[in-house]
Amino acid sequence: MMDQEMQHCRKIVRFDPTISTANQGDFIIRNACEHVLHDCFPVQLSVAVPVRDRLSKVSMKHVGSADYAFVCGTNLLSSDMRRQRMWNIRLRDALMMRCGDLHKRELLNFRLIREKFQRTHIILLGTGWYQYQDEPTGYTKRILKTLLDGQYLHAVRDEYTRQRLLKLGITNVLNTACPTMWGLTADKCAQIPTHKAERVVTTLTDYRSSPEQDAQMLTMLQKHYREVYV
């Protein structure tokens, strides 16, 4: 039985947004992505690599040898990926992940490079675009077209991100919303209470803080709920 399971085992790499961050939203999204990947690949060898820290050679080798590598949510894409490194990756890193096990002499063989690209699948899983920005730079277009798989569908969290990728020539993309929402089936939603509770959970954004508006919101919540959790 174990031998049969190992035959179906897939090496799955997760670009994990929770490494080197205190943003609790990233943990929620990462957990949702893990549930999705477990459903798709019940038997898997799972490896997590960072998105906020630059990848080591070991991490890049894991990506290059994986059956699939998934970018687990959050707004990692940006219009200027040279300067705004929400996803801390460079063009050279992208090439290393997709061609790293080729010998230097083989890098001149475009057939081998094409075959290697076809074997390395880096796929977006509910990923979004950082804020609302100007048109993407030529560097951003090049790095994303080098990084992202051209065979499988990419899942992005909103229509804005999908349109950005379409304009870059990346057409195998669907607007699926955030993976945290994928479990909100009709049956699940029917179980959600419709009456007002006595306790409420809220969050505050630290990287775009608005102290005055935050204080107004917290005051209002304290007025209407017995307990407020932040």
Label each region the model flagged.
Residues 1-230:
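Active-site anion-handling motifs in enzyme catalytic cores
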